[in-house]
Amino acid sequence: MARIAGVDLPRDKRAEIGLTYIYGIGPTRAKEILAKTGVSPDTRIKDLNDSEVAALRQVVENDYQVEGDLRRLEAMSIKRLMDIGTVRGRRHRAGLPVRGQRTRTNARTRRGARKTVAGKKKATR
């Protein structure tokens, strides 16, 4: 099993798809990496030899921010926005949509489950 950037790549997938299991590598970046290393995108992960895996590992680790480093970088960027008090930072802190979406309705994913508030009681006769 090929292990790149701390991720076990699925053996039966094509190299092009298998690389996308690494956080920070999507389909386009996977194609770039395979082109740089000269590995065919149609090769299965289990069919890669040790030198190809080593080449892939070297390109991923040296040229791209992936996995923990990328997550840390994103968290630090959001924290910076919150610290300097930008509108985006305040929206992050409040748990609201950051990019101008409406919040009167929808925005359920970002705001979380509904908190029911007791309504006005009906007058009994």
Swiss-Prot record:
GO terms for cellular component: cytosol; small ribosomal subunit. Keywords: Ribonucleoprotein, Ribosomal protein, RNA-binding, rRNA-binding, tRNA-binding. InterPro entries: Rbsml_uS13_C (IPR027437), Ribosomal_uS13 (IPR001892), Ribosomal_uS13-like_H2TH (IPR010979), Ribosomal_uS13_bac-type (IPR019980), Ribosomal_uS13_CS (IPR018269). Residues 101-125 have a biased composition (Basic residues). GO terms for molecular function: rRNA binding; structural constituent of ribosome; tRNA binding. Part of the 30S ribosomal subunit. Forms a loose heterodimer with protein S19. Forms two bridges to the 50S subunit in the 70S ribosome. Located at the top of the head of the 30S subunit, it contacts several helices of the 16S rRNA. In the 70S ribosome it contacts the 23S rRNA (bridge B1a) and protein L5 of the 50S subunit (bridge B1b), connecting the 2 subunits; these bridges are implicated in subunit movement. Contacts the tRNAs in the A and P-sites. This is Small ribosomal subunit protein uS13. The gene is rpsM.
